[in-house]
Design a protein with these regions (language model features):
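Alpha-helical transmembrane segments of multi-pass membrane proteins
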Residues: 85-108
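Short membrane-interface helical motifs at transmembrane helix boundaries
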Residues: 67-86
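Interhelical loop/hinge segments that connect adjacent transmembrane helices in multipass membrane
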Residues: 151-159, 174-217
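Interfacial transmembrane-helix starts/ends
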Residues: 13, 48-62, 203, 207
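Helix-loop junctions and terminal segments of transmembrane helices
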Residues: 28-43, 262-272
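Membrane-interface junctions at transmembrane-helix termini in multi-pass inner-membrane proteins
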Residues: 103-125
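Hydrophobic alpha-helical transmembrane segments
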Residues: 124-138, 148-183
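Interfacial/gating helices of multi-pass transporter permease domains
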Residues: 3-20, 151, 155-156, 201-209, ...
């Protein structure tokens, strides 16, 4: 793909910017909110409320995943979304599959963290990235080197790797739940009388806790989308550029450099 690498990177970046917005809408802040609330009720020995909270959060994640995934699948073919580049349609539809299950995965991680179990969350993240990278590299090699196929198909399979990674992470989380479900259900502990908390109240608490995260993360995604949808319109106004040149410049601007500084951010977060 090296001859089309910048075009491929530009297409990949465009798909992921839209995908990131849908992920933010469906999950932003909710795992952290779940973690805090579960830890709060467990600290009060109200494990029954924690279990009710877990169920409410999982139902909420399932609903948001189905809604956001379906919407993204449907609007992928809208001209206002693909912005004149029909290659973006299969990329968005391949990413939509991941949105169906990523909210469930993210909520499950938050639940484990609420029980002070960091290992399942960390292992699931490692497995997610491992599966994603293996599938991405394998599919790209198969399409480009063996089948001599389209670079657009290779990009679509590279983005579909997010779904494969999410499945791997969900398997790890399910196995962890089977192993620790006795602890998570409060087996062997003295439980306080269950506080009467309605499902609606629990959902409102989750939403209230997650609002700051949604605002901040959505803001970042929206700025990236503004760049994405204005870049191709603005560049012809400042020079004579072909579509290929614009794609190359966009890849340098929105993808290649981003991946380098994200390494620094990841290291800074780890040290913090």
């Amino acid at each position: 793909m090296y001859k089309r690498q910048d075009e491929a990177n530009a297409l990949y970046a465009q798909g992921y910017n839209i995908y990131s917005l849908f992920i933010t809408i469906s999950t932003a802040g909710i795992p952290s909110a779940i973690s805090k609330l579960v830890a709060h009720y467990n600290g009060l020995n109200e494990y029954g409320v924690s279990q009710k909270l877990n169920r409410s959060a999982l139902y909420m994640a399932l609903a948001s995943g189905v809604i956001c995934g379906t919407v993204m699948m449907y609007i992928a073919s809208w001209p206002i979304v693909y912005n004149g580049d029909t290659n973006l349609i299969p990329v968005l539809r391949s990413l939509a599959w991941a949105i169906f299950i990523i909210p469930l995965m993210a909520i499950s991680r938050g639940i484990f963290q609420g029980y002070s179990m960091m290992a399942p969350s960390a292992i699931s993240q490692f497995v997610e990235q491992l599966f994603r990278i293996i599938y991405m590299l394998g599919a790209t090699y198969l399409i480009m080197k063996i089948q001599k196929g389209s670079w657009v198909s290779a990009v679509s399979q590279s983005t579909f790797a997010a779904f494969i990674g999410a499945i791997g992470a969900c398997v790890v989380l399910c196995l962890a739940w089977l192993k620790y479900r006795g602890v998570m259900q409060g087996t062997g502990t003295i439980e306080q009388p269950v506080t009467e908390v309605s499902t609606t109240e629990l959902i409102l608490k989750i939403v209230y806790q997650s609002i700051p995260f949604i605002i901040i993360e959505s803001g970042i995604n929206l700025f990236q989308l503004i760049d994405q949808y204005s870049f191709k319109r603005m560049m012809p106004l400042v020079g004579h550029f072909t579509k290929y040149q614009i794609d190359v410049l966009y890849a340098l601007f929105a993808f290649n450099a981003n991946k380098l500084y994200m390494i620094i951010i990841a290291l800074a977060n780890a040290l913090a």
